[in-house]
Amino acid sequence: MTERRIIHIDMDYFFAQVEMRDNPKLKGKPVIVGGKASSRGVVSTASYEARKYGVHSAMPMSQAHKLCPNGYFVTSNFGAYRETSAQIMSIFRSYTDKVEPMSLDEAYLDITELVRPDLPASKIAQYIRKDILENTHLTASAGVSYNKFLAKLASGMNKPYGMTVIDYQNVHDILMTLDIGDFPGVGKASKKVMHDNGIFNGRDLYEKTEFELIRLFGKRGRGLYNKARGIDHSEVKSSRVRKSVGTERTFATDVNDDEEILRKVWELSGKTAERLNKLQKSAKTVTVKIKTYQFETLSKQMSLRDSVSSEEDIYNIAYLLYNDLKDP
């Protein structure tokens, strides 16, 4: 049986990153997303600069203001977050149809079928993170392992913009020394019960019997028993089948020079061909989409008699479609 390879991608301080990308004046500043400092809401996301002051998600905005009075308090812009998230999920689905989004900024990918001797899971994770950075100008952290639990654990170990691989060689050492509060799914209430029963790290959890953990946590006890051993049989639950492969880019400033745009079309044609090649697929339809400075989306597509997969073929069709869009 082929060993599963799962990637967990978690965007770094996603809401705050989007705000800093869309407003460069915020870059490097303590950004706190959620609302005005005087509001009665809670913090959605805080940049790492704000976290140095002790600000964290779900904290009351008033408390965040006390800790970081010079912070930049930003009202959540869910339209921008959803649009960027859709772009990221599209990148995931250009690699595999086995994608399970967990929120706007994180997802599991089962890439077992893509892994080859010359293309390990870690390299695929690097490609995905690179695509996210090039397409959205945002960073993501990744965890790679043989099950979902360990992949999620790994994605949080080297944030921001890091990647960790947990395999059979290092899993025991990682789990045994892990603080119990760092186990995914262990919240404040569970942590208190753990501490009250002498469980402070993975080794303490490992040494408890399944019966003891069920007595303390009910049905969850069996899951905790398995987690201490790195066991998780849950599948990546995908709800969509990928039918397209594509690449998008957003220019830093408005561009109306044909030569510059076509250079980018050539680059994107190459990226798309590269993805098709990795997936050993070809295309029967080519689509070009343009978003204007007024945020109007224009698109044209061409269905083909013979499928294409090369950079040149994709570019030649995209070139025709671009000219049709430019001069309808």
UniProtKB/Swiss-Prot annotation:
* Binding of Mg(2+), residues: D10, D105
Q: Where's the active site on this chain?
A: E106
Q: Which cofactor does it need?
A: Mg(2+)
Q: Please report a single Pfam family linked to this protein.
A: IMS
| Entry's EC annotation | 2.7.7.7
MF term (GO), any:
magnesium ion binding
Work out whether the entry's keyword set contains Transmembrane helix.
no
Q: Which PROSITE patterns match?
A: UMUC (PS50173)
> What are the subcellular locations of this protein?
Cytoplasm
- Highest taxon of source: Bacteria
Query: How is its cofactor bound, per UniProt?
Result: Binds 2 magnesium ions per subunit.
Q: Which reaction does it catalyse?
A: DNA(n) + a 2'-deoxyribonucleoside 5'-triphosphate = DNA(n+1) + diphosphate
Report keywords, A-Z. Cytoplasm, DNA damage, DNA repair, DNA replication, DNA-binding, DNA-directed DNA polymerase, Magnesium, Metal-binding, Mutator protein, Nucleotidyltransferase, Transferase
Assembly and binders:
Monomer.
Q: Which family does it belong to?
A: Belongs to the DNA polymerase type-Y family.
Protein's recorded name: DNA polymerase IV
Q: Which organism is it from?
A: Staphylococcus aureus (strain bovine RF122 / ET3-1)
